[in-house]
Amino acid sequence: MKLTNSQNKIFEYCIYLIAFSLFLFFFKHTLDYGRTYDDDALLDQFTRSPGDAKLISSFLYAKFHFYPVYFLTHELDNFLTFLFNFSGIEILNTKIAKFTNIFLHVTNSFLVYLFIKKILRIENNLRDNILIFLSSLIFLFHPITSQIIFNITTRNESLALFFGLLTFIYCLNNAYDKKFINYLFIALLFFLSLCSKLMTIYLAGLIPLTIFLLNFHQINLKENFKKNFDVFILLCVTFFVYYYLRSVFTEKNDIFFYDSFNDLLFYFFTSSKFYLIGLFYPFEHIYVYATNYDLNLAIILFTLFIIYSIFATYLFFNKRDPILLISVFWIIASLTLPVIFGMVDKGFPLISNLAERYQYSSVVAISIIFFWILKNLSNHLYKKTLALSFYCLILFSCIFILYDRSKVYIDNYTFMTETDEKSPKNVHRYSFSVPMRNAVKNNDWTAYKFNLYQFYQLNTKFDEVILEFLRYFIHEENEAGIKFFEDEFEKQFKDKPYGIFKLARFYVFNEEYQKAKNEIKKIFKQYDKIKKQLEASGKKVTFLDPPIDDLYFELGKINFYQKNYDKALENFKTANVINPLHATALYNAAITLKKLGLNKEATQLYKDAIEINPFLRETANNLIANTNE
């Protein structure tokens, strides 16, 4: 059946509303879940910062990740929350933020529908439009999208795909109707996509390649290359402009891959296996296959994907059908960087080398594959019945698994525990440290001691468990226990300044000030030794962990707590001389000056501290008011 243009528009509005209604029908309850986040830097540096400090907080956060669009959407959430509550409609910010995530995801599902229509050049055919819509529902309910939808701080993936799909659609329009305005939109949308997530760089190659494949059998090779060259150059230039701007804000981060070829090969195959299983068989809990480092299974799955790629290539050359080959290249392009991440040994800047959310955009390929299946197996009744039955089975299974995974995001405690408890790197933290905290809350010291001893047996060298034992024995006033674990910590961390600094701060927290001083003195001695060794070989010290200004700052706190205010002031000033942007050192120096009765000088230091770090504004303003009374 052929639709008119107006009927086609009505159809598109209807399917968007149907998709939105379907998703809310199954997942409306998640709007009432608490805030979950896996990004402490975001929470501390942006979400909690006062209004006039948002800009500087996003700048500080950009030292790690450059996500300006992401921050703007969170500010939009805050603004909408304010408008609703100002109008008398009481609503939590978490509900607004979660609704924004759902809105973005459903919109991406609709863009997948439009994208498939564009690559197939299907305009107003009702039957094909329905099949494309059914295929887009696979994207909508695919289980690996769970974290993107239900976790507020992983919105950048959906934003990146949103702008990426719009870029793709405009490029397809431009391929058949070249206009200057299209080039402007392409550059802007691709720039916004990169600002949301750098991993969408793959579109710079995938978009021209897709257009090339679509035209391969229609025009000659030279003309085909010319048709794509302008878009390819535009996307590359946009990327280089973005990357230059990003390099201005972010700090340099060195990553190191595994040295051994065997290790590289092993992690290439196992990382590929992780993402291929997540894409094609997402019906197990993620960590069932995340912790499975079976190389044989990984090679088998990779081989199956190669066979599928060969089949798609056969259809392209012999049947002139580019659809499956486009899906192959989409999977390869979108998963290249995530697989490379899996081969990083040290210095990876994100939370985990392997994460399902990194492959959010690759789910588009699954919708393309399902459209091909529904389209090519609907010519005969029995094939149509088989295809639709298979589709319904997969769709309902996806909804069921996605519903089950949504329960992880009830609150942040559940989220952090459930998502990491089976991770081989984090099992010691979550199997016993979480029950320990619960036992303390419930005043159940038997359960606390049981989990503490189990925690220690898992990893006797882990600093967290040694400090936990110290905390316990200090509470129990058990001198023998304290001595044993102090010696144990000394044995494990005597040559590691960052470990010694942890112990010093632990002592400060427990008001063991002289012990804390002694530990910091040990670090200074080690630094003097390191400095002499490097200077003897003509090298220069550029970075220390912990930084020297932090050592003086900690000494200042200790002297302040001991009421040795003159010495504390000297330490805080030294920290500020070493690091002029150490606003907290200035702030504490101001408090010390107030203790010494120098109110005028204290007021000036408060103002200097606020100028460097507006986060201190509210507290400092109160103290200034008190000082001037």
Residue spans of the language-model regions?
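C-terminal luminal/periplasmic domains and tails of membrane-associated envelope-modifying transferases
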Residues: 2-3, 417-629
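Polytopic membrane enzymes that build or remodel cell-surface glycoconjugates and lipids
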Residues: 2-445, 453-464, 470-472
